[in-house]
């Protein structure tokens, strides 16, 4: 329709053609001449293009009624731009000579129209609008004779559009386009015989089924406030003078016209809204074409007088059922504003609900298969090459292009794995939901392989298509996943020696290299006992390098990846921040800590091994290292005072008895610290490491490697009491602190032991009674630690404080063991309290807690 309006606005009309010429033109297009206009309209109902052709021919035919003064001529070379093919006749000496209109180029479309031609534009519009109306050819002649040839006698606004916005209207959307004008009264339908009524009704019904407005079947104006399915439903007013039997039958067929027009509206409204919708609309266009073929076949039957309403209803009944299913599905999609993957999900679920309706189910299966083609093409590119081609953001994987591996902070190189590619949940079709994680990992693997400088070459070509009746796409996804997983695993384990790096990390950060640990502590003890602000990192690095080259670690190929680090927080703070996944650690105020409390080893690892040994994993290793290293330092200090206190053997028996309490306390401290170290290193770390290594021998993909490695670290942290929920690490830290204070106290009082020894040697030559009296009082010399306390009193206080802390620690372990018997905490209790020395005191504390 719009093509015809553009045609008449830009160009003048052709010369008049005789009736025989017009008839010949219609015959040349395959339409029977000599029939009434409804036959032409019937042929036009088959496809909208045919309607445009027939209307143009009618324009040329009716031009013979115009007076000679208004006739216009065109040169033979004149051509016309149209959106649909246009055929007409050119007036020449011979009326039967056909005229062929050639499409003009864009630059020539505004040329060739004279001033006189533009003056008669209103006359041409009048003829076009009347030609496509429901008037017959003779009726149009009556109108022109009655109104005359003056363009001023015609109204300016003859056309009333439907409620569909112009931007939704396409050459396929007719939607009962209404043309108002002077109507030629038809014969009274009530006065016609029943067969004539049925024949006329059939003719108009076939037009109505394709969206052409007729007089007996008038579509009602859409209700603006309609909601739900009614928004895309069309009701019709049937002529009241029709026979009731015909009215009843036509009412059963008219819903098909409503379904068809609703489908056309949705096609027009969703055009260009993504690849999935475009592909679905293409499939619906094929369905529309098949529907037009059915109407054409019905028209052929009508021309041969072999069609009745009852037969038409019988023929169209299966089509109505199927079209209703298509219409209702599309309306629900449109009302819910579903797009892309949501459309595929709805149609896929709709298939399951149509188990009893095979025809409708097969049709929806065909629609889903075609609508999913662009989505499956994107999926194939992702799992085959790791590439995303998604202009409309329809795919389930999104590429966060802002995050690049080379631009990431040093501590977050593993974020390339975690953040570069992520799932878009709203774009996952239901039939891919179970495999979405596998799809994501497949493309990730391929991209990591490409980042390692290797070329991604699939072993075989794949053709990924979605078929709701089979699971072939699942096998294609699985094959692509296993190929990428095996290839990346080979890159990590073989080409980059991931296991060698893991062994090196365990050797240094979990104190598995015993001789290196002791030599390093001997070399760095003086430096680490300073305040952290006075410790020189360069000195530590030099001592580390020296120790690595004189110990058995000199043969380690990755020893140069080990470095020293001074952290601005203690172990408790680090543990809290790791468990809470905080990142801005440097924002906290600096604490007054010693170098020993802030020291940790760090391990420098390069891509792609940083996927496994990422910053969080190294931080967890550091937590284990710091607790083990601190306990090892406490053990060394206790051993040192044991050596220095050997001088007490030279004391007199009465004087030496005063030191027995100090020696006993030191031994109890040594027993607790050594058993704590043995528990963490031998009973926790080694068994878990052995399990981890055994599982790594059968691993199939990198995600399993990540999972196994994290399970190993988490299990070690939990059983080594380094989780925020247990608070046991605070008790361990307090125990170590009291042990170090005790060692410091013993070392400070060491000179008094030496004085006592010298005095005892001098007094051997003096009076024996005086010597005994002074030797008895010698250990009771006041110390600078506390002028009011004697040595034995200080030892007694240390004993009481240590015992209370240790019993509280054991009590906490007992409490946790009751809640979770699978933990290994009770082994530590049995080791420390091996002779039930602390049992009575623990029971006493439990009773006191229960009472008050």
Swiss-Prot record:
One of its GO terms (biological process) is mitotic spindle-templated microtubule nucleation. It holds the Pfam family GCP_C_terminal. GO terms for cellular component: centrosome; gamma-tubulin complex; gamma-tubulin ring complex; gamma-tubulin small complex; microtubule; perinuclear region of cytoplasm; spindle pole. It is found in: Cytoplasm, Cytoskeleton, Microtubule organizing center, Centrosome; Cytoplasm, Cytoskeleton, Microtubule organizing center; Cytoplasm, Perinuclear region. Keywords: Cytoplasm, Cytoskeleton, Microtubule, Phosphoprotein. PANTHER family: GAMMA TUBULIN COMPLEX PROTEIN (PTHR19302), GAMMA-TUBULIN COMPLEX COMPONENT 2 (PTHR19302:SF13). This is Gamma-tubulin complex component 2 homolog. It comes from Drosophila melanogaster (Fruit fly). The lineage of its organism: Eukaryota, Metazoa, Ecdysozoa, Arthropoda, Hexapoda.
């Amino acid at each position: 329709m719009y093509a015809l309006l553009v045609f008449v606005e830009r160009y003048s009309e052709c010369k008049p053609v005789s009736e025989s010429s017009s008839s010949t033109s219609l015959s040349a297009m395959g339409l029977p001449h000599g029939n009434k206009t409804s036959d032409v309209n019937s042929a036009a109902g088959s496809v909208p293009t045919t309607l445009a052709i027939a209307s143009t021919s009618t324009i040329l035919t009716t031009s013979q009624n115009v007076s000679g003064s208004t006739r216009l001529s065109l040169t033979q070379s004149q051509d016309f731009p149209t959106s649909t093919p246009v055929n007409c006749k050119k007036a020449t000496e011979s009326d039967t000579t056909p005229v062929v209109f050639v499409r003009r180029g864009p630059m020539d479309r505004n040329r060739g129209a004279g001033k006189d031609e533009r003056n008669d534009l209103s006359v041409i519009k009048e003829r076009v609008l009347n030609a496509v109306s429901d008037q017959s050819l003779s009726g149009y002649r009556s109108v022109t004779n009655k109104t005359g040839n003056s363009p001023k006698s015609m109204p300016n606004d003859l056309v009333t559009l439907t409620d569909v916005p112009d931007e939704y209207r396409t050459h396929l959307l007719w939607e009962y386009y209404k043309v108002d004008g002077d109507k030629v009264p038809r014969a009274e339908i009530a006065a016609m015989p029943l067969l004539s009524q049925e024949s006329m009704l059939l003719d108009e019904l076939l037009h109505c089924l394709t969206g052409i407005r007729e007089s007996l079947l008038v579509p009602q104006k859409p209700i603006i406030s309609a909601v739900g399915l009614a928004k895309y439903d069309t009701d019709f007013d049937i002529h009241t003078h029709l026979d009731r039997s015909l009215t009843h039958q036509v009412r059963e067929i008219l819903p098909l016209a409503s379904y068809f027009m609703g489908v056309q509206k949705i096609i027009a409204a969703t055009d260009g809204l993504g690849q999935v919708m475009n592909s679905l609309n293409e499939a619906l266009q094929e369905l529309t074409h098949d529907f037009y073929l059915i109407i054409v076949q019905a028209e052929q039957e009508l021309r041969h007088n072999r069609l009745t309403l009852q037969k038409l209803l019988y023929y169209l009944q299966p089509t109505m059922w199927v079209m209703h299913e298509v219409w209702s599905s599309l309306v629900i999609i449109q009302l819910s504003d579903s797009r892309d993957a949501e459309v595929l999900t709805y149609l896929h679920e709709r298939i399951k609900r149509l188990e009893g309706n095979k025809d409708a189910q097969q049709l929806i299966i065909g629609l889903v298969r075609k609508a999913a083609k662009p989505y499956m093409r994107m999926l194939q590119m992702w799992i085959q090459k790791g590439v995303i081609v998604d202009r409309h953001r329809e795919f389930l994987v999104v590429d966060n292009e802002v995050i690049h591996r080379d631009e990431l902070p040093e501590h977050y190189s593993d974020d390339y794995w975690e953040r570069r590619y992520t799932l878009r949940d709203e774009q996952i079709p239901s039939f891919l939901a179970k495999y979405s994680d596998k799809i994501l990992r497949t493309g990730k693997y391929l991209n990591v392989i490409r980042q390692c400088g290797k070329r991604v070459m699939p072993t075989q070509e794949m053709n990924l298509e979605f078929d709701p009746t089979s699971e072939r796409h699942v096998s294609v996804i699985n094959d692509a996943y296993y190929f990428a997983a095996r290839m990346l695993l080979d890159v990590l384990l073989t080409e980059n020696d991931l296991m060698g790096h893991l062994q090196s990390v365990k050797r240094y950060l979990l104190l598995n290299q015993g001789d290196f640990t002791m030599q390093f502590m001997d070399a760095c003890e003086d430096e680490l006992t300073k305040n952290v602000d006075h410790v020189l990192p360069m000195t530590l690095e030099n001592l580390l390098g020296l120790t690595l080259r004189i110990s058995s670690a000199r043969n380690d190929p990755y020893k140069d990846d080990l470095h020293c680090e001074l952290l601005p927080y203690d172990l408790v703070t680090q543990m809290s921040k790791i468990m809470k996944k905080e990142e801005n650690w440097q924002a906290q105020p600096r604490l007054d800590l010693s170098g020993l409390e802030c020291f940790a080893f760090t391990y420098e690892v390069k891509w792609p091994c940083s996927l496994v040994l990422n910053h969080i994993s190294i931080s967890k290793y550091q937590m284990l290292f710091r607790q083990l290293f601190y306990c090892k330092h406490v053990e060394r200090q206790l051993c040192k005072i044991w050596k220095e206190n050997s001088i007490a053997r030279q004391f007199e028996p009465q004087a030496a008895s005063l030191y027995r309490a100090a020696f006993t306390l030191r031994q109890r401290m040594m027993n607790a610290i050594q058993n704590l170290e043995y528990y963490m290193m031998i009973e926790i770390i080694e068994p878990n490491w052995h399990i981890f290594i055994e599982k790594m021998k059968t691993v199939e993909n990198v995600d399993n490697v990540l999972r196994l490695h994290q399970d190993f670290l988490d299990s070690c942290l939990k059983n080594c009491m380094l989780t925020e929920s247990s608070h046991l690490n605070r008790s361990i830290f307090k125990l170590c602190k009291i042990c170090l204070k005790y060692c410091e106290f013993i070392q400070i009082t060491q000179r008094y032991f030496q004085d006592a020894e010298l005095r005892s040697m001098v007094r051997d030559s003096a009076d024996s009674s005086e010597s005994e009296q002074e030797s008895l009082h010698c250990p009771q010399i006041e110390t600078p630690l506390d002028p009011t306390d004697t040595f034995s009193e200080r030892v007694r206080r240390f004993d009481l404080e240590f015992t209370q802390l240790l019993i509280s620690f054991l009590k906490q372990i007992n409490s946790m063991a009751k809640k979770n018997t699978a933990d290994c905490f009770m082994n530590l209790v049995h080791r420390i309290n091996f002779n039930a020395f602390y049992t009575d005191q623990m029971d006493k504390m439990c009773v006191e807690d229960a009472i008050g």
